[in-house]
Amino acid sequence: MKLDAKSTIEAGKAILGIELGSTRIKAVLIDQENKPIVQGSHTWENQLVDGLWTYSVEAVWYGLQDCYADLRTNVKSLYDTEIETLAAIGVSAMMHGYMAFNEKEEILVPFRTWRNTNTSQAAAALSELFVSNIPLRWSISHLYQAILDNEEHVPSINYLTTLAGFVHWQITGQKVLGIGDASGMLPIDPITKNYSSEMVDKFDKLIAPKGYDWKLRDILPKVLSAGENAGFLTPEGASRLDVSGHLKAGIPVCPPEGDAGTGMVATNAVKQRTGNVSAGTSSFSMIVLEKELSKPYEMIDMVTTPDGSLVAMVHCNNCTSDLNAWINIFKEYQELMGIPVDMDEIYGKLYNHALTGNADCGGLISYNYISGEPITGLAAGRPLFVRSANDKFNLANFMRTHLYASVGVLKIGNDILFNEEKIRVDRITGHGGLFKTKGVGQRILAAAINSPISVMETAGEGGAWGIALLASYLANNGNDQSLADFLDKHVFTGNAGIEISPTAEDVSGFNTYIESYKAGLPIEEAAVRFKN
């Protein structure tokens, strides 16, 4: 029998997902049909302390408590009831970074987030040692950099985890981590669905001369796949989340996951030959692979889905920020002319007008580098618009080049997967700000990666919904379905979203554009060198 939202909450059948993102902590309650029924949130910011980006442990708990309190308030105002118990809980957070604890469970140095780039020496050395691409932001890079820097705390490490792993440990007592989040600490062996034992052994041998009391295996969280038992909410955990004291202990908690994994779940992209692209301030693509790549590539990170399939991730620092800055110039023009401003209309008109331009943007090129872009080898960036005197300079081409630029670096990374590795995909789902204007961002991305792109209404629900779905998979998967089948049958039920396929003309035009773009990169390098 289907219960209404109020009865679902009162019967303890609702499921809670909480995600700690870089600017917001979001909580969502879902019903027995896996649909969101109420949300809560808390806004927070990272701090730069001693040259490193961090959030304090106090800020983590204050943020979680405030987010949960906001959820409680919304439950009260919408349904006039109280959350006493739940069918399951899931916690997810931004991946990677460094949270190291001693045996008294005290944090040894402030949490170092994924944003820190002080690990280049360690990442380069480990990439060579492991014969695998080890990004700067991965936990193992942070650990080895601390060792290289002879940091005092290293001998005292008893446990090393991610933000999601930390919160889960504190509310359940379990030192575990979902496989997707674990794959951002250290590479995963797709066969054993555990940390690569070869790499763990190599690391221990590398640091053996230091004589630490610990081995790498001893300090890492146990790896779990989606649906596995990851512990229960303890009385201390319940009071840490809900300071009002209403929430009861004993609720099952699913394996904690990273934001990449919850994004895959929220877009129904955990099956092999599917993928998703997140395109907002920054962008990334995640393609679920059928087999390992033939060799490591510096611009492709290897992670996994929450159930352990290999994923090739291309991450770009820049996406829509420069595009938005140009849109604001047109907004200023309208205000100057005394024309009423409707931002949705400005975006809609300019984006759609871009589609009337030349497929190769008439020769115009844009570099949208607000910050550096590792894939194209730039440590810093300067937004740059470049044209020759005889290019076709008009508004449609001007807007089109800025739309192309928003996914240009993403194309360069994905061209390796599709052209060199011959990866095949059946469906890619897009989500994020670039797709807000119907059909335009989709068509541009379809041309960039020569693949049909779907957009779903629910994609905007994001990671908190994704981790709630993983908690639902733990609680409601009575007949042992795979995660992909569970999502297909019980969540998305045939909703593949609205799909746009690339046209031959757009694909050919984008390919011409990207060759000019790559040839012109020294212009961007010069801008970085000479423009303060």
Where are the predicted features?
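Active-site core segments that coordinate phosphate-bearing ligands/cofactors
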Residues: 2-10, 16-17, 83, 121-177, ...
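N-terminal glycine/serine-rich phosphate-binding loop of ATP-dependent small-molecule kinases
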Residues: 1-110, 124-125, 156, 217, ...
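Carbohydrate-associated surface elements
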Residues: 116
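Glycine-rich phosphate-binding loop of ATP-grasp-fold ATP-dependent ligases
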Residues: 109, 181-188
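Conserved phosphate-binding/catalytic loop of the ribokinase/pfkB sugar-kinase fold
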Residues: 113
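Conserved alpha/beta enzyme-core scaffolds, especially Rossmann-like or related mixed alpha/beta domains
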Residues: 178-181, 213-225
